[in-house]
Regions:
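N-terminal organellar transit peptides
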Residues: 2-4, 10-218
Length: 218
């Protein structure tokens, strides 16, 4: 199994800069970086008064996963923090990282009032992160994308029949989780989402609003 290198990801582009009126962290001066037990928040997160702001503006990676985990641990110990606002602009990236980040954010929804703001593009694994909160917003010109999960064994790598079967089973499990969460928050069926994923479907913020993926476009 050591020779098996799995890459569950899509090609990504560098996201463009974006801004949410009255909500973007760029609209507020960074005034507070709070140390806890010798640690400080990463460059993704800062705190002002009772609100933590987290900006995920890139492809999702294990580094992002680690930073977000550590930041959430820190702000969870800040008794003044009641709200978490996540600003998301990502073409996706590692599927494992996307699922892990989604799990970490979901874990704190009982602790904080979590809101997620989509802008630019939210695609592939980043959609899983977007679905975490019930408070989901998007800019008017934001686009979303869903596609089939795939794997790449790596250049020059070979796979046995049993390894291929194992990977197919894994892809089916990951796809089932992805689709289950899409069905949970939208008015589209499992079959409809599966068909959309086969074709790599891009859709607008207005479509996302009509389907229930987004609570408001602003």
């Amino acid at each position: 199994m050591k020779k098996l290198i799995v890459l569950l990801s899509i090609l990504f582009l560098i996201p463009a800069n974006f801004c949410f009126a009255n909500e973007s962290p760029e609209a507020t001066t960074k005034t507070m970086t709070v140390p806890f037990d010798g640690k400080q928040l990463s460059d993704l997160t800062y705190v002002i008064e009772d609100t933590a702001y987290m900006a995920v503006y890139s492809s999702l990676s294990l580094l992002d996963e680690k930073k977000i985990y550590e930041d959430l641990q820190l702000i969870d110990n800040m008794t003044n923090v009641k709200k978490l606002k996540v600003f998301l602009n990502s073409f996706g990236g590692g599927m494992y990282a996307g699922f892990a980040i989604a799990d970490q954010l979901k874990r704190v929804t009982d602790r904080f009032e979590v809101s997620i703001y989509a802008s630019g593009v939210v695609a592939s694994a980043a959609v899983m992160v977007f679905l975490v909160s019930e408070n989901r917003y998007a800019t008017e010109d934001c686009f979303f994308m869903v596609h089939e999960i795939s794997f790449n064994p790596g250049a020059g790598a070979s796979m046995s029949a049993s390894e291929i079967k194992l990977m197919n089973n894994l892809v089916e499990m990951l796809t089932a989780r992805y689709v289950k969460n899409l069905v949970r928050v939208t008015n589209k069926s499992e079959n409809e989402w599966q068909e959309m994923m086969k074709e790599e479907t891009w859709f607008s913020a207005q479509d996302a609003l009509d389907w229930g993926l987004v609570k408001a476009v602003k």
